[in-house]
């Protein structure tokens, strides 16, 4: 059965309105999870606007909610050393009481990286670094000790303690690249997220590619949850959004994420929830 989630990118938003909306969503059973995003600069105009930092905010939102699973779609691998990310994830899972989900991506936003002097690299470098980083994170979160020697990351007899509350924090990998991203999804992910497909057919085609990658390594593709992002504009008709979500569910999508834009108004949640439950 399809599930539903909300996403509140912190660009141009204020802490009080995001907090209010998440608390309201926590009381609406239709929404199983809530998400933010990991950037320091807004992606939509005005580009010189504000952007709250995602991990700091998630720790506070974990304390402010009791039921929603929560995470960030997705965290850029280039922004933090994967050993740091692993420790942050384990700690956040304790704060959330086992509700955290770890979203990971290769990174892409060049203006932000240039402004902060954070190396982003070529596409090949990004995905090579991403593959290494995911392996480091998964190992640190699940094994007693980790030694890894790659091109981008080297760790020696490293520990990450305490381990998460969950036996395994779900690893969410976002993207649509058929050759590299979906191959990494097949190898490491518990959950694949795709943002705004052009239509259901595009998602179906990429899902077939993911299944091929799974077959190549002997993994059951049913082990991987699938989600899709939809924009949720202020003037969107909830019934139309529900119809779109139903079409995605029929195609095999497990979770539909409704991504909002600031200003955030908690009063928008109930009409959408009613349409989804109808």
Where are these regions (language model features)?
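Active-site-adjacent structural elements that line small-molecule/cofactor binding pockets in enzymes
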Residues: 1-278
């Amino acid at each position: 059965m399809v599930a539903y989630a909300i996403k509140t990118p912190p660009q141009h938003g204020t802490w009080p309105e995001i907090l209010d909306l998440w608390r309201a969503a926590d009381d609406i059973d239709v929404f199983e999870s809530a998400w933010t995003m990991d950037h320091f600069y807004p992606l939509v105009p005005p580009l010189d606007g504000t952007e709250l930092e995602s991990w700091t905010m998630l720790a506070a939102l974990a304390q402010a909610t009791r039921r929603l699973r929560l995470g960030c779609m997705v965290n850029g691998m280039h922004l933090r050393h994967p050993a740091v990310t692993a420790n942050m994830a384990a700690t956040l899972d304790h704060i959330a009481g086992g509700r955290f989900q770890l979203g990971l991506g290769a990174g892409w936003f060049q203006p932000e990286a240039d402004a902060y002097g954070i190396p982003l690299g070529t596409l090949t470098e990004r995905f090579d670094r991403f593959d290494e980083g995911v392996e480091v994170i998964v190992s640190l979160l699940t094994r007693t000790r980790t030694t890894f020697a790659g091109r981008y990351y080297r760790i020696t007899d490293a520990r990450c303690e305490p381990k998460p509350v969950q036996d395994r924090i779900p690893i969410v990998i976002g993207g649509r690249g058929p050759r590299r991203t979906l191959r990494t999804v097949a190898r490491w992910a518990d959950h694949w997220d795709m943002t705004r497909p052009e239509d259901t057919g595009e998602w179906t085609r990429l899902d077939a590619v993911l299944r091929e990658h799974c077959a190549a390594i002997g993994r059951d593709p049913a082990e991987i949850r699938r989600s899709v992002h939809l924009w949720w504009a202020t003037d969107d008709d909830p019934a139309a959004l529900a119809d779109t979500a139903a079409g995605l569910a029929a195609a095999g999508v497990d979770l539909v994420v409704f991504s909002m834009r600031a200003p955030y108004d908690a009063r928008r949640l109930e009409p959408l929830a009613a349409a989804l439950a109808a």
